[in-house]
């Protein structure tokens, strides 16, 4: 079974990278750890944690989306509702709420969801954001919760992966065939490594 480490990165879109930097780096305090591109096409990554990042593409003509409260149902083509970012302590939830209030930005009251406490806001691009802290003593990883009043038959199979529902791998890719192809950013990082080696000599 594959062991996931977290969300390597989420990729969003902005038409105004400067206001995005002001919010994510300067207000929320997330380091800007990667910046690639040029006018007309950029992608910047902000550090959420040691393993998790959020990225923004900047494309010409992009406008902020219409703000929609998290969890409010809509119809038509849709695949995204909101992003929730975890906080280490309950105090940090209130510290963050105070920062949003001081900045003149809307922030919800602290909401009790039974297993997390949360506040909600929006970033400059209209993205609905939730900031959450796990309630002490509620361990859904150890004791999963299923409170759906009418779960499907597939849901009733349980919380654990049903590995027999997909075809098994019959032939694994041998090491000598594991080719990796260059993608956007690879040349830049290679050049940075060369420059670093030169300065270190």
Task: Go through the PLM ranges and name each one.
Residues 1-7, 13-34, 48-106, 122-201:
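Glyoxalase I/VOC metalloenzyme domain signal
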Residues 43, 106-107:
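Histidine-centered metal-chelating micro-motifs
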Residues 40-41, 45, 50:
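Ligand/cofactor pocket segment of small-molecule handling proteins
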Residues 38-42, 113-117:
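Short acidic/glycine-enriched loop/turn segments that link adjacent beta-strands
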């Amino acid at each position: 079974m594959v062991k996931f480490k977290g969300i390597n990165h989420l990729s969003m879109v902005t038409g105004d990278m400067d206001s995005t930097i002001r919010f994510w780096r300067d207000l929320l305090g997330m380091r800007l750890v990667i910046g690639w591109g040029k006018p007309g096409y950029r992608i910047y990554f902000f550090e959420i944690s040691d393993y998790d990042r959020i990225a923004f593409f900047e494309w010409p003509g992009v406008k902020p989306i219409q703000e929609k409260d998290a969890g409010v149902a809509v119809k038509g083509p849709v695949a995204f509702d909101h992003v929730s970012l975890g906080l280490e302590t309950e105090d940090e939830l209130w510290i963050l709420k105070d920062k949003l209030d001081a900045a003149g930005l809307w922030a919800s009251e602290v909401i009790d969801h039974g297993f997390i406490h949360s506040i909600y806001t929006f970033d400059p691009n209209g993205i609905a954001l939730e900031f959450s802290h796990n309630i002490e003593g509620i361990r859904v990883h150890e004791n999963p919760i299923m409170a759906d009043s009418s779960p499907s038959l597939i849901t009733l199979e349980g919380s654990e992966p049903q590995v027999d529902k997909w075809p098994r791998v019959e032939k694994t890719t041998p090491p000598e065939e594991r080719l990796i192809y260059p993608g956007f950013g690879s040349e830049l990082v290679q050049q940075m490594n060369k420059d670093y080696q030169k300065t270190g000599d």
